[in-house]
Amino acid sequence: MHDLKSIRDNPDGFDAGLKRRGLEPKAAAILDLDTRRRAAQTAFQEMQARRNDASKQIGALKKSGGDASALMDEVASLKERMPAAEEEDKALGAEIESILASIPNLPASDVPDGPDEDHNVELRKWGTPKSFAFTALDHDAIGAKLGLMDFDGAAKLSGARFVVLKGQLARLQRAIGQFMLDLQTVEHGYTEMDPPLMVKDGAAFGTGQLPKFGEDLFKTNTGHWLIPTAEVPLTNLVSDEILDEKALPLRMTALTPCFRSEAGAAGKDTRGMIRQHQFHKVEMVSIAHPDASGAEHERMTQCAETVLQRLGLAYRVIVLCTGDMGFSAQKTYDIEVWLPGQQRYREISSCSNCGDFQARRMKARFRPEGEKGTRFVHTLNGSGLAVGRTLIAVMENYQREDGTIEVPEALRPYMGGLEVIG
């Protein structure tokens, strides 16, 4: 959510930020509504003050035996007019809030400009993309040959974009999730959480999924939304809270199922596990001091990178351009892992600094030490990592010519010492 005062103070700057996002200017329309609303507020307040003053005068006249009929007529007229002014104030306020709620976060100054993913900028690479003396297979071909990945059975149960993992492959996915959680909690200091998988409208609004992206979510018949990421419940834990400055940063992590309708993904990644309606992910969330959120963003991204380094998986880090960032982000790093079966890098983590954008929607604040007032916190979120896509990366990078899969050393303690699957 955007600060109306900052739009009043710098409308050109606001429109410039929207232009970088590929959007039309909106400041003038917002400020016109704001002017009309403030006029309605002033009119209502003036009528209210006059009514109160006249009522006192009426009381005094009645006590003294004077004629209060003219004042009584005036008060009656004010009472008739006041509801319309109050209603106009509320209606204009709601219209402003609706517009502000639909506008994405403005990009940070160091985010590269561009309309789409072709304008993202590579920052660094780690590791050498794996090559084989044989033709590398996609993960779905590997899983099918092992008889441990069943898309047909999942389709019979649930339709497209689901999978049933079996035996040691199911165990490997569980091991990956546990390995990630242990790394993020024990070594990186995140507090493990086990949040609800369903949230109310207010939580989905707070992190920016609503009102614009409801079609990307699954909704229950009770009105709850299935979480698309643990970012939603974890971040909203601080909604309507005033935190102590000493408590910052708050770092939380959770391994949860995630649910996405993939409404805009028709025809994309229809084979395999790359794009599923249901998947597991370890999410990292930080609630940070505004002055420290930039450094926290770099730290969070490194925490995600460490997972891939421990697993020996080559990857690259890119900074998303203005046209490819998510709705709530002011700056985003994507981590893309090398998949030999596809001969390309694919996204496995997205780490975003949302500034105070989500905090304003959630009313999440902190009280600076020694000050009476409060400030909005900054919120950050990142995958640490997507478990299913990490499973894909392990399968493709550790495949062997005989169709088996070598278990990375870092995962063997979670697999009972197992070294090879198949």
Swiss-Prot record:
Subcellular location: Cytoplasm
Protein keywords: Aminoacyl-tRNA synthetase, ATP-binding, Cytoplasm, Ligase, Nucleotide-binding, Protein biosynthesis
Stored HAMAP family: Ser_tRNA_synth_type1
Region Disordered, annotated ranges: 1-20
Catalytic reaction annotation: tRNA(Ser) + L-serine + ATP = L-seryl-tRNA(Ser) + AMP + diphosphate + H(+); tRNA(Sec) + L-serine + ATP = L-seryl-tRNA(Sec) + AMP + diphosphate + H(+)
Keyword presence, Membrane: no
Record GO terms (molecular function): ATP binding; serine-tRNA ligase activity
Gene name as annotated: serS
Assembly mode: Homodimer. The tRNA molecule binds across the dimer.
Repeat as UniProt keyword: no
Primary subcellular site in the record, as a coarse category: cytoplasm
Family membership: Belongs to the class-II aminoacyl-tRNA synthetase family. Type-1 seryl-tRNA synthetase subfamily.
Free-text function comment from the UniProt entry: Catalyzes the attachment of serine to tRNA(Ser). Is also able to aminoacylate tRNA(Sec) with serine, to form the misacylated tRNA L-seryl-tRNA(Sec), which will be further converted into selenocysteinyl-tRNA(Sec).
Free-text comment about domains: Consists of two distinct domains, a catalytic core and a N-terminal extension that is involved in tRNA binding.
Protein name stated in the entry: Serine--tRNA ligase
